[in-house]
Amino acid sequence: MNYKQNLEDDPRKKLQRGLDNRHVQLIALGGAIGTGLFMGSGKTISVAGPSIILVYAIIGCALYFVMRAMGELLLSNSQYRSLVDFSTDMLGPGIAFFVGWSYWLSWVVTGAADIIAIITYMHFWWPTLNPWVVVFSCIGFFLVFNLFAVKMFGELEFWFGLIKIVAILVLIVVGFYMIVTGFTSPNGTVASLNHVWNDGNIFPRGITGFFAGFQIAIFSFVGIEIAGTTAAEVKDPKTVLPKAINAIPVRIVFFYIFSLIVIMSVTPWDQVIPDRSPFVEMFWLAGIPIAAGLVNFVVLTSAASSANSGIFSTSRMIYGLATQKGAPRVLGKLSKYHVPANALFFSCLCILLGYTITSLSPSIISAFTIVTSISAIAFLFVWSVILVSYIVYRRSRPQLHAKSVYKMPGGVIACWAILAFFAFMLYLLTLEHDTFIAFKYSLVWFAFLGVTYFIFLRKKTAKENE
């Protein structure tokens, strides 16, 4: 099967390559560092203890291989613009339909969750602020930066990513200084790396606690693949994408591992408060009185970055589906600024609907957990399809792999190993009540997609192939 784009040859009707190397580097960084690190790391530390460092390292390593597989696939054919394109080519339009719409859903529900988070952070300064003012302001703001040129989106994500980097760098520097100087906390605890080793017992909660850490930590990596969705809008993808992907392990080690080591060195794992940000606690212990306000600003921009990335990703995914006849044709139209404006408006409306449904829940926390779990399950499916596409690519296009200058390390064997790991992650997500509910909702979603494809698209596709 030879892949053919369903796009016009007119360059005015194609996505514009407006993203520079610095944009993609920070977009990739923003995708690898989510709100979960700033706000959720306290819970992961309390659940898993020092072994949480291994949890983040294992998940990060697995997703690095996913990104390498995606990178080789995207660069093997200049016509590939996203995972929908290579999954269509390798696995057929049916799987591409599933993965495209599932990826879209994952970012829609993530966007709704991000809006909830932004409202919470805004209430830190303005407790009586009407939530709907925040909702419409956020969506309007992100629309402006996405409607006119892809470079505007890139600039916004660049600065959002820079804020994250600075915040984590400051934490690591301040924490390292506290360790070196033997800082003593008000309760008499002396900062030391010995707290991380925990007298040789890095699994204080046992294997159960270690596995529980995966359930929470997986959410922190949602969006790591977003750099791949920019392939059609990067000025020099063959140079820029490998740089962005190759830097992922360094970023994970530096920003996740180092920050967790510093946090647990200053505050022993069993003294970390689960429902508080360990970043806030660190700055407070260091005597920075405006720590809460500073970290609130950082997590606010982190949630805003995630929502903005979600709007970008959903619009490009819908655009790709529309050009492959997996979505209404009108959603595949580009504006004079070379952006899929109709797809942007459609995705924003769905994010608004998602927030509305979530806000009606009697328990916002429970609803938040469910929607983020649905997102994580959808992402596990998407990441798995990337790996399966790579396995098929290696079998059916050996000549392309032989010519590739960006080969995935480990090849097919690594793909199967990571697929087994993802299956285990899915099993872990069924062990908790809220995440099991999300699992059942996800099954309903896949059943809905199956019925939709069979009724509306399967026969149409078969006729066109005759």
Residue ranges and their predicted role:
Residues 16, 39-134, 144, 250-253, ...:
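Extracellular loop-to-transmembrane helix junctions
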